[in-house]
C-alpha cells in the first residue's frame, strides 16, 4: 500500500471540489450533472449509467468501461495517486449501497498519528455483478464474470467465473 497525506491543502481543495460536483449530481441527476461526474474520471466508457447517491473523493483515478451500471448510493473512497486507482470493466453491475474502498489507515496507533492514508488499487474485470451492500477493500481484483453476494466483504482477490459471499467473502461455487 502506498502512503499519501489526504490533509494537505491541495487534496482538501480537490476533495471539496469533487464533493460539490457529487452533491449537485445527487441533488439533480440530470444529463448535465452526470456529464460533470463522468468528467471527473480518468476514463468513462459509452453507455455508463450512474444513479443518484454516488460519492467519490477525487475521481481522477477511476476508470469505467462501456455499459456498466452503478446503482444508488455507491461510495467510492478513491485516492489521488495511481496506487489507489479503481478500474471497473465493461458490462458490470454494481448494486445499491456498494462501497469500493482503496484507502485505509495504519493499524498501529502511533503510526496513525501521522494522519497518513494508504492506498491500493481495486480492479473489477468485465461482466462482474456486485450485489447490494457489498464492500470491496483495497488491493482486491475481481475476475471476469464473477458474482459478489449481497452484503459481502471482499478482502482477497476473486478468480474469474466465481461466486463469493459472506464476511469475509468466500467462494460459494464456480460458474
Predicted regions and their residues:
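Short-chain dehydrogenase/reductase
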Residues: 49, 129, 147, 163-165
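Flexible, glycine/small-residue-enriched loop-and-beta-strand segment within the central core
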Residues: 54-64, 69-141, 167-168, 174-175
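Beta-rich strand-turn-strand
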Residues: 131-157
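C-terminal end-helix/capping segment
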Residues: 154, 158-175
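Terminal amphipathic alpha-helical/low-complexity segments used for targeting or macromolecular assembly
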Residues: 1-47, 107, 169-172
